[in-house]
């Protein structure tokens, strides 16, 4: 959520930033109009309350002097009714303002490129060279079924489209990837490992920006009023919701693996085969809490943490800056990492790393103190995929496939695969 003072002091800037996202800047005028009404109501209410205090003294004085106080008692009642009415009006305006403010996205950083869609994202780095095959490479969805690493048909029978059973060495590879990623982040990148709740309440979803605007993308357990998480970013970021982080704690760096659940509303017909776009998938997440002046350097560091995984696995990738028309709701700046997939003959997103500045912290009321005597300030929050496990799985299977139908295990993963160096079709 944005600071109301930005609307008061820099309305032109806020309008231009909103317009860059393709949204209607008139919302700024709506907020300013409601803010003016609110301030007038507060002023009028304060005057009434001051008069009520004075009338209360007059009533007491008249009673002490045994004088008739009927007129001031009547005024007191009228004032009470008027104050109640003003408070009701103020509450209504507050609700309207909050309802609008919570749907306005974060302000985009000045160095984010302008554009309308992912076609306008800007490549800033490329690592590795896509492999040239001496044979016709297969898509990962064909490879995993031939090697009995996955079963899409039985998953569809049990749960519907966009689900998968990972079986045999497929399940082992998924687990190995999660263990490898978590181990690297905790032992080399300085993150604290967390196991997170995978059902959260509405306040938690509000804190990170999924609610109220993106409810259609979520799965909800109606009876309990809980939501399945679309990413571990949600519970990790809300760890400090409604808290003041004490001096000396920041920077705080969390990492956690979780299942992620997404309805994929609006993605009909896209990536319908394989592991790229499922309703349920595993992901290793990184979340950071930073002092405001440190958050931009933290974004660069977190992005290199994700890149280190891809490089150690030997997977060609590129880094792009998301343009103004493609960046997420809560982010001020986002880097996407895209891994090379031979089946697409293209790069596909495997990680997003974002600086959300104080946007989520204001929604979730996450503050910190620089020292014990200092006034609490809003922290900056960052999040990044480190990495999407299913997409990493797909990238390994495709990039490390062999002509004889086997898949070579990347060297970095061998210890996490029990020493296994290759996946072959099971005998049975």
Curated annotation (Swiss-Prot):
Signal peptide: none annotated. GO terms for cellular component: cytoplasm. It comes from the Bacteria. PANTHER family: SERINE--TRNA LIGASE, SERYL-TRNA SYNTHETASE. GO terms for biological process: selenocysteine biosynthetic process; seryl-tRNA aminoacylation. InterPro entries: aa-tRNA-synt_IIb (IPR002314), aa-tRNA-synth_II (IPR006195), aa-tRNA-synth_II/BPL/LPL (IPR045864), Ser-tRNA-ligase_type_1 (IPR002317), Ser-tRNA-synth_1_N (IPR015866), SerRS_1_N_sf (IPR042103), SerRS_core (IPR033729), tRNA-bd_arm (IPR010978). Its EC number is 6.1.1.11. Homodimer. The tRNA molecule binds across the dimer. Catalyzes the attachment of serine to tRNA(Ser). Is also able to aminoacylate tRNA(Sec) with serine, to form the misacylated tRNA L-seryl-tRNA(Sec), which will be further converted into selenocysteinyl-tRNA(Sec). One of its GO terms (molecular function) is transferase activity. NCBIfam families: serS. ATP binds at residues 262-264, 349-352. This is Serine--tRNA ligase. Pathway: Aminoacyl-tRNA biosynthesis; selenocysteinyl-tRNA(Sec) biosynthesis; L-seryl-tRNA(Sec) from L-serine and tRNA(Sec): step 1/1. Consists of two distinct domains, a catalytic core and a N-terminal extension that is involved in tRNA binding. The keyword Cytoplasm applies. L-serine binds at residues 231-233, 285, 385. It catalyses: tRNA(Ser) + L-serine + ATP = L-seryl-tRNA(Ser) + AMP + diphosphate + H(+); tRNA(Sec) + L-serine + ATP = L-seryl-tRNA(Sec) + AMP + diphosphate + H(+). Pfam families: Seryl_tRNA_N (PF02403), tRNA-synt_2b (PF00587).
């Amino acid at each position: 959520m944005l600071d109301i003072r930005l609307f008061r002091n820099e309305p032109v800037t806020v309008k231009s930033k909103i317009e860059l996202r393709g949204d209607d800047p008139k919302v700024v005028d709506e907020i300013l109009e409601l803010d003016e009404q609110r301030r007038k109501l507060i002023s009028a209410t304060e005057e009434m309350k001051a008069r009520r205090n004075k009338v209360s003294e007059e009533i007491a004085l008249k009673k002490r002097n045994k004088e008739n106080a009927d007129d001031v008692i009547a005024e007191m009642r009228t004032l009470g009714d008027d104050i109640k009415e003003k408070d009701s009006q103020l509450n209504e305006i507050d609700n309207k303002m909050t309802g609008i403010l919570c749907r306005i996205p974060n302000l985009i950083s000045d160095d984010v490129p302008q554009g309308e869609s992912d076609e306008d994202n800007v490549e800033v780095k490329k690592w590795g060279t896509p492999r040239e095959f001496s044979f016709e490479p297969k898509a990962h969805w064909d490879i995993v079924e031939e090697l009995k690493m996955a079963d899409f048909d039985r998953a569809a029978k049990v749960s519907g489209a966009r689900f998968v059973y990972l079986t045999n060495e497929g399940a082992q590879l998924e687990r190995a990837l999660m263990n490898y990623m978590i181990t690297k982040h905790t032992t080399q990148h300085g993150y604290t490992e967390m196991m997170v709740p995978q059902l959260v309440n509405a306040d938690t979803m509000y804190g990170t920006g999924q609610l109220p605007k993106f409810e259609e993308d979520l799965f909800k357990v109606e009876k309990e009023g809980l939501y399945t998480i679309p990413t571990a970013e949600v519970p990790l970021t809300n760890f400090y919701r409604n808290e003041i982080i004490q001096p000396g704690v920041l920077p705080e760096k969390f990492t956690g693996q979780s299942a992620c659940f997404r309805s994929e509303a609006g993605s009909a017909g896209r990536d319908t085969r394989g592991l790229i776009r499922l309703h349920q998938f595993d992901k290793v997440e990184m979340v950071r809490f930073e002092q405001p002046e440190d958050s931009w350097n933290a974004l660069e560091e977190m992005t290199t943490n994700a890149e280190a995984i891809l490089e150690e696995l030997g997977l060609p990738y590129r880094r792009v800056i998301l343009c103004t028309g493609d960046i997420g709701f809560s982010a001020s700046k986002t880097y996407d990492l895209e891994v090379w997939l031979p089946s697409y003959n293209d790069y596909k997103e495997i990680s997003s790393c974002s600086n959300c500045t104080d946007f989520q912290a204001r929604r979730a009321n996450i503050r910190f103190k620089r020292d014990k005597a200092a006034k609490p300030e809003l922290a900056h929050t960052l999040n990044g995929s480190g990495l999407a496990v299913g997409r990493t799985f797909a990238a390994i299977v495709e990039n490390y496939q062999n002509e004889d139908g086997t898949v070579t295990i990347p060297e970095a993963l061998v210890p996490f695969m029990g020493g296994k160096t290759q996946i072959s079709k099971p005998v049975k």
